[in-house]
């Protein structure tokens, strides 16, 4: 062989090694097909921009351990192209690094390119400069929009291809999404909307990724794109694929819901999520994505209007990346049970059998020795049914999974997974006035502003999304000083009013009602008076038709002076975009030196004050959080990086702040002397109440009945599938407890085998109780990082109350 031939062979081998294993991804009416093999896939949404590169490996590893096969993420256009033609893929924006990290863990990727994503993200992910393109109308058959959408989509796909990230190149991306929930707005555009959908599908095909494309909430998604479902109950609400040759895909199964300021959080139980996933699988669903699996943090100004900084904290992995139990563990067991059924589910015929008015059996299998069944009870009451000559007690509103059509391996209403208690502990108090310095914004006068208009300007058009804040000022003559009333009709989100430099009041809207009327009494000078209004946005809109037409800000300004009304809509107004502290970047070390700071003084006479202090990083590896419970409204920075907006003073209807703790990723921190800067808009904020906290799981609890199935054994080395899953139907259910890494069970706080009252949140000994409960559990668990206790009378020395369904409830402390 010649030297040239050796070189050629070497290059070919290197190309194969670099590319990895090329996969052929297709689909039929049952599921996605990867290299000729049908797959049931569980996916979890983890957004690279809502965490940090340092967190990615742990998040992905925990997702894999929880039975996730696919990591799903949006691609954020406004993050990657904040200015037209200027691209940024650095730091937490490094999507290539994120996808490669997913591949390193042996998982697939679903890439949701959008480019409109909604996602409670500023402007739905669209860059604001797009708003300024002449003649543009978003998300319809509009040439300027289509031009930029195509240019962006091609750029992202080209980037993915250049890194060999599609499965057709040996990469992990097996599925892509174009557009997002267009069915929610399509009617507003009528025929142009239908044309846009067809054009979008054609664009996706032309991008030639070698993997299938989906459109969610788009019932008429053109071939070959697959229409997919979003929502909490797709097993009940999804009409199904629009072609018999397309699989049933659930792109967003909401594990909780995003929270807005002033609204209570929506808590969704592990049992409810599992029920609807199992029901979707029973009805031939084959791909389920949890939105979110890890929500993370809306750092900076990335949250959309009125959305809090913490995002989907109730997901299986919480905001800090800690396991949210029992949600994480219960879904892991569900995934394992379904994987036990994968072969008959995908290769067998489905038969539906009525077991009662609200009870149904879905049976899968071609052969007698290859059979799986899913028993569904839609009733709110327990039901006993007969199936294949055996009796089954079905819990209320539950689904039972029978991998062999005989034995129950999993029931959605019976939780074997432990419950966790998350605790925040103050590590450093910033309570000394000597620790703080302050700098107060000055209220600009008309003559100090650089933008002039003879009418009221719209907020977003003026700020161009460079700041949440817009000053609008004017001056007028008053012949005599007199009590007067200022009336401002405002389209949100908040407004602070000043007359002659004095603060006279504030008002704000809500997520559901942006518009409000600020009406404040004031005293005017005899002669010239200066009126200054600070319009404040709390995130850009992110959904609905015609985003490019949205307006925010003052719509009318009036002053009643006791005799007549002055109208200011067509007065000369001066405008200033942003605050002085923003202009000088006072939240950075260099910018901080550009203004004159003063020693903190306990004065609440003026809002719009910047505070700065320094703190040392808490020891250990527990997540770090900033407790802002003593503050009002504003934004916080650590070492120049924004950890997000806060609005502690906006309480829910139950009287609670929407959010108190704000995540500081450890990668933002230095060992010592971290710069903390707070912008406080309101007068009531007190920085002396701020603490630096750590977050950890300090208590674990298990509550398992002797009627529960034994947990599915799932050795998680190469992924969940039938080959590496085993199940022993003769084994007893058990309580399993595990402390976080580095901690052990130090104390048993409660233990009762029998009929304990309550649950892990609130409990007491019931009428039936084994006196050996505490001793048995202490022997099995104390000084161990993990333990298990069989829920069986023999474990506790006998049955003191026969013919009674018993359970074991254990609560333990981790130290």
From Swiss-Prot:
GO terms for molecular function: beta-galactosidase activity; carbohydrate binding. This is Beta-galactosidase 16. Residues 1-23 form the signal peptide. Belongs to the glycosyl hydrolase 35 family. Its main location: secreted. Transmembrane segments: none annotated. It comes from Arabidopsis thaliana. One of its GO terms (cellular component) is apoplast. Ubiquitous, with higher expression levels in siliques. The keyword Glycoprotein applies. Its EC number is 3.2.1.23. It is found in: Secreted, Extracellular space, Apoplast.
């Amino acid at each position: 062989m010649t030297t040239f031939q050796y070189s050629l062979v070497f290059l070919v081998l290197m190309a194969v090694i670099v590319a990895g294993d090329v996969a052929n991804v297709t689909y039929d009416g049952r599921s996605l097909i990867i290299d000729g093999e049908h797959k049931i896939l569980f996916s979890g949404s983890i957004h690279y921009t809502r965490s940090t590169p340092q967190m990615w490996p742990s998040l992905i590893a925990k997702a894999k351990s929880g039975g996730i096969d696919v990591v799903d993420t949006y691609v954020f256009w406004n993050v990657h192209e904040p200015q037209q033609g200027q691209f940024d893929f650095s730091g937490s924006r490094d999507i290539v690094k994120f996808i490669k990290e997913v591949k390193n863990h042996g998982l697939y990727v679903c890439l949701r390119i959008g480019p409109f994503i909604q996602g409670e993200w500023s402007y739905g992910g669209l860059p604001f400069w797009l708003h300024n393109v002449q003649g543009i109308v978003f998300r319809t058959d509009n040439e300027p929009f289509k031009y930029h959408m195509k240019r962006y989509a091609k750029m992202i796909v080209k980037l993915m291809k250049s890194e060999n990230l599609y499965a057709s190149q040996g990469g992990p991306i097996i599925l892509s999404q174009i557009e997002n929930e267009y069915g929610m707005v399509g009617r507003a555009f009528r025929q142009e909307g239908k044309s846009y959908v067809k054009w979008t599908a054609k664009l996706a095909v032309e991008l030639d990724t070698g993997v299938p494309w989906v459109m969610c909430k788009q019932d008429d998604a053109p071939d070959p794109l697959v229409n997919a479902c979003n929502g909490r109950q797709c097993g009940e609400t999804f009409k199904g694929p629009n072609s018999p040759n397309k699989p049933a895909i659930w792109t967003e199964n909401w594990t909780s819901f995003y929270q807005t300021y002033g609204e209570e959080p929506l808590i969704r139980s592990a049992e409810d999520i599992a029920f609807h996933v199992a029901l979707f699988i029973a009805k031939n669903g084959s791909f389920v994505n949890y939105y979110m699996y890890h929500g993370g943090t809306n750092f900076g100004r990335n949250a959309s209007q009125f959305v809090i900084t913490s995002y989907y904290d109730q997901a299986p992995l919480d905001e800090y990346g800690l396991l949210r139990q029992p949600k994480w563990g219960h879904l892991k067991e569900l995934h394992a049970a379904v994987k036990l059924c994968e072969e008959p589910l995908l290769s067998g015929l489905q038969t539906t059998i009525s077991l009662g008015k609200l009870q149904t059996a879905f049976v899968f299998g071609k052969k007698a020795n290859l059979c799986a069944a899913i028993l569904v009870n839609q009733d709110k009451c327990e039901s006993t049914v007969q199936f294949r000559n055996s009796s089954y007690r079905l819990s209320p509103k539950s689904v039972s999974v029978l991998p062999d059509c005989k034995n129950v391996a999993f029931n959605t209403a019976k939780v074997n997974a432990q419950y966790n208690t998350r605790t925040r502990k103050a590590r450093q108090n910033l309570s000394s006035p000597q620790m703080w310095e302050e700098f107060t914004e000055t209220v600009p006068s008309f003559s100090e502003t650089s933008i002039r208009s003879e009418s009221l300007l719209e907020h977003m058009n003026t700020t161009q999304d460079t700041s949440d804040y817009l000053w609008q000022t004017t001056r007028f003559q008053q012949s005599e000083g007199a009590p007067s009333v200022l009336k401002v009709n405002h389209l949100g989100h908040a407004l602070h009013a000043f007359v002659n430099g004095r603060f006279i009041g504030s008002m704000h809207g809500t997520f559901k009602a942006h518009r409000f009327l600020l009406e404040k009494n004031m005293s005017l000078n005899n002669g010239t008076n200066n009126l200054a209004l600070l319009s404040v946005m709390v995130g850009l809109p992110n959904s609905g038709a015609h985003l490019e037409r949205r307006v925010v800000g003052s719509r009318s300004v009036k002053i009643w002076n006791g005799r007549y009304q002055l109208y200011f809509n067509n007065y000369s107004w001066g405008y200033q975009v942003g605050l002085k502290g923003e202009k000088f970047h006072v939240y950075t070390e260099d910018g901080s030196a550009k203004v004159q700071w003063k020693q903190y003084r306990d004065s609440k006479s003026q809002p719009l004050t910047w505070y700065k202090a320094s703190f040392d990083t808490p020891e250990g590896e527990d997540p770090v959080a900033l407790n802002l419970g003593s503050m009002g409204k504003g934004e916080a920075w650590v070492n120049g990086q924004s950890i997000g907006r806060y609005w502690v003073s906006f309480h829910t209807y139950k009287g609670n702040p929407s959010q108190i703790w704000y995540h500081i990723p450890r990668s933002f921190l230095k060992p010592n002397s971290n710069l903390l800067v707070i912008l406080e808009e309101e007068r009531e904020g007190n920085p002396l109440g701020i603490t630096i906290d750590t977050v950890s799981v300090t208590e674990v609890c298990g509550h398992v009945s002797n009627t529960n199935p034994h947990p599915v054994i799932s050795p998680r080395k190469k992924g969940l599938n039938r080959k590496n899953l085993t199940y022993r139907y003769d084994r007893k259910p058990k309580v399993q407890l595990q402390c976080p890494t580095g901690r052990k069970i130090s104390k048993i706080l409660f233990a009762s085998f029998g009929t304990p009252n309550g649950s892990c949140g609130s409990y007491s000994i019931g009428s039936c109780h084994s006196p050996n409960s505490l001793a048995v559990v202490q022997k099995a668990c104390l000084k161990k990082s993990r333990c298990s206790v069989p829920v069986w009378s023999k474990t506790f020395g006998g049955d003191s109350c026969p013919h009674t369904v018993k359970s074991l409830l254990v609560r333990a402390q981790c130290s």
